[in-house]
């Protein structure tokens, strides 16, 4: 009996150890266990803050109820700031902070949202300075240019509609199999009244294999958008 108890405790401890590695947390995110991934990532300290920010943003975007989305983006912001403090040379940390601020702008007042717009741009530029081939940052920056230009305030921040398509094309060239890039590109094209091109991007996105929970959710979004465009 003691042997089985000891064995059981040993297996439980092994599970705890495995759950508290960056790779294990990343796997949890890929499987859609986002709240658990956030909690486990925080336990990793400096090694887990980027993952905590990612998990929090994903939870807010994919699973959270409307009333709790803002608070989860707050968590993402806090974790991303800690990630930058821990490693100022990590492009992913700046990317996650930009992502959190981009979403938080939807929940904050007008003046604070304007300040966040500058933060999004600056942090994406920092991410790209550290990693010029960061496809996700290119996609986010393309959306930043589109959003501010279409809101009529692009001139205040240096946003330029002419940057939107080139940035998306660069990102897709770097990561042609990434579903979310295609879906976001399609969304931008539709907003620019280039619906035929948007349809092609959505159809391509749906032809790609969904390897993660996020991929599955992004393809669900693609299907819905495709139905609306056709």
Regions found by a protein language model. Name each.
Residues 17-63:
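N-terminal leader/linker segments that initiate helical-solenoid repeat arrays
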Residues 24, 52, 57-59, 97, ...:
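Structural register within alpha-helical repeat arrays
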Residues 47-48, 90, 134, 178, ...:
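Residue-level recognition of tetratricopeptide repeat
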Residues 58-67, 103-112, 147-156, 191-193, ...:
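Short coil/turn linking the two alpha-helices of tandem helical-hairpin repeats
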Residues 179-184, 188-191, 199-230:
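Terminal, low-structured helical/coil segments at or just beyond the last alpha-helical repeat
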């Amino acid at each position: 009996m003691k042997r089985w108890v000891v064995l059981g405790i040993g297996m439980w401890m092994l599970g705890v150890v495995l759950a508290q590695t960056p790779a294990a947390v990343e796997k949890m995110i890929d499987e859609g266990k986002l709240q658990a991934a956030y909690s486990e990532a925080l336990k990793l300290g400096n090694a887990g803050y980027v993952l905590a920010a990612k998990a929090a943003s994903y939870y807010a975007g994919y699973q959270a109820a409307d009333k709790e989305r803002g608070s989860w983006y707050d968590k993402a912001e806090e974790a991303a700031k800690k990630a930058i403090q821990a490693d100022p040379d990590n492009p992913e940390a700046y990317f996650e902070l930009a992502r959190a601020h981009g979403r938080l702008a939807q929940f904050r007042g007008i003046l604070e949202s304007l300040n966040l717009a500058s933060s999004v741009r600056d942090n994406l530029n920092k991410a790209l300075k550290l990693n010029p081939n960061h496809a996700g940052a290119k996609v986010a920056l393309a959306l930043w240019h589109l959003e501010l230009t279409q809101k009529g305030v692009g001139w205040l921040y240096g946003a330029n509609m002419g940057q939107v398509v080139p940035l998306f094309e660069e990102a897709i060239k770097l990561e042609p199999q990434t579903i979310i890039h295609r879906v976001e590109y399609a969304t931008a094209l539709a907003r620019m009244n280039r619906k035929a091109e948007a349809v092609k991007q959505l159809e391509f996105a749906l032809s790609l294999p969904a390897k993660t929970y996020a991929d599955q959710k992004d393809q669900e979004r693609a299907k819905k958008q495709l139905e609306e465009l056709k």
